[in-house]
């Protein structure tokens, strides 16, 4: 490759102005377009969707993004009265709405239930009575028609009328003298009845023991969008702080998807700033002490920055949008880019001649770039935007960095930088490198034993597809969730499922009815512990309602209605109640009923309705049902429940599990493709199968060794760290290529200096990466923490194999004449 880069160097050396113009112009162009790039912060949108169900689970469904507001007593020994908790919740919700007048982050808050709702709902229910009456309930109704049952109920009716001060009780008795409400809708309309783990008192929502007041906030954005969520979370947290300061006896707890998303993002940012920031400071100090000139530091940083800007511009030209997580993951790939710069700088540090440096280094650097790019480009064969973005950005970063290092960087190298120290080199590093890593039988024997153990154990490494395990468990959010589960979840885990149709509400209602029948069978089989019947009782398709209306007409014959009227008048007379009091009820029995739509009637408050039904902007209709199950049977339950037609679980990570496993399988295939590509490039470059295999050795073996020791230490692959393992592949190729170039120079010409120069550069490259990755071990976020541990294991195996096993195998093969002849190595 020096035949390409040397003429370029000489041309720009004689035309410095043109070189500076090209450098500045390209930097400005790349920087301008790189700044236009948009970032996707929602990790879920970066995963592949293989079906409509998956796509729907990832859509902006308001219920899964709902925020839970809880107000309880700060002093649990002296609890606040429920009435005070309810008032406090109203005040807090009013404060939130006032704070949101300009930002419009809140779509709505459901904090109380209108006391008139029961009468409105009863009026609608009686106007469409047959539609809500399951045929299985006619047996109970028939029992209510006996004279004894009527007399017993009439006594209760009389007591209600006697104690009625507003007239509402009398109206209720007139509309429903048989108390059919207890048969039909008692579990829904009675304010004292628990509904989905909640109770109502004076219109306020409470947990069953009334020690916690509840409210539900619906964000005006996707809960997994941590960008928009950050402003919303800050706004709510400020309101909580102000409200608690004004009400010292009150404790406010908040939990929901937006808070979890923002908490994870903030934790990642803090971890990266602290760990990488401190590690880079340490690296800066070491580099200045080693090179004795600050210019060497910026000469390492600028090419990497140029490559990053070049990559951002390319991403904008190709896609226009990029995964923010892929950008964060790509930061560690910059370690490979620094490695190329180190080889240029350290080689120049020793030889003091830019042309000789290019003659010696252009081929291994370019070859290392090509093979590493091949490893990253293999990610383009996956179905995940996250992996593709990572592969593209890493590829363009390395290309931009390599071009800068070989075209522009040599013009900024001057002999005065190394005049004071050139002949002394790096004594401590050289002493370390001079240790007999490849000649000591104990070192080789121990390494071979460790390699065998790693390879044997490698099949036992596991892959964790559950993205929920990558969440950071914030203390405040954990407290809020724990309180909610303790007070409302009856000891079981709860999750919402949705029956849906693309556009037809009636079809969605039919799917929902079928779904509830499926849930009923699962409950009888003991697979689930229970489910909320609300959506099944309230929402019925026109066809289903018409069938129920026909059954109603068949039950209420003229003879039965006449007998009921006679019995009601007689029973009412015993309490001196008017004989015409129940005329409106008798009229209901004779009414010519038509199917109705309780949603379009608007009698259910929007905040309450959102717990059971949602119509999306694209016309899709969804009906929600809360299902209770034993936590340890989660996977079994989720799969069993979603076997129903047109039903999804409102947990995107459920679908992520299967898709992340697909990504894992894609990744394994990608590694094989990348390996074959790298081996072919090495074979084409060295033109000798034995040399290509030796150069390929560290990358190939280190992958299995890393997996083996992950299994030994109980570490598992996940979506994040498996991507980073590509980096281990890439750096392993680079190190082996540079060592191989040095070994060949030593074997052919007897020049040991080339190998020494390369090993010094490898040492500094490995040191930089080791410091950065070791710092990640101290991160609080589990995803970042796992990256640090796995990268350390991979780096250690790569360095040991490159330093010892690769030279050992090469020197053993050099003892054979066929090997020396095949690669023009002279006889000893």
Residue ranges of model-derived segments:
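Extracytoplasmic
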Residues: 166-293, 513, 584-678
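Hydrophobic transmembrane alpha-helices and their membrane-interface caps
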Residues: 296-343, 691-739, 804-805
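Solvent-exposed, non-transmembrane loop/terminal regulatory segments of multi-pass membrane proteins
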Residues: 34-76, 193-202, 433, 437-439, ...
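Pore- and gate-forming transmembrane helices of large, multi-pass membrane proteins
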Residues: 301, 353-382, 696, 748-780, ...
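Juxtamembrane segments of multi-pass membrane proteins
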Residues: 440-564
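Signature of alpha-helical transmembrane segments and their immediate interfacial
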Residues: 1-41, 410-411, 415, 419-466, ...
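Alpha-helical transmembrane helix bundles of large polytopic membrane transport and channel proteins
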Residues: 29, 83-205, 209-213, 526-604
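Transmembrane alpha-helices and their membrane-interface boundaries in multi-pass membrane transporters
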Residues: 317-318, 333-349, 362, 366-370, ...
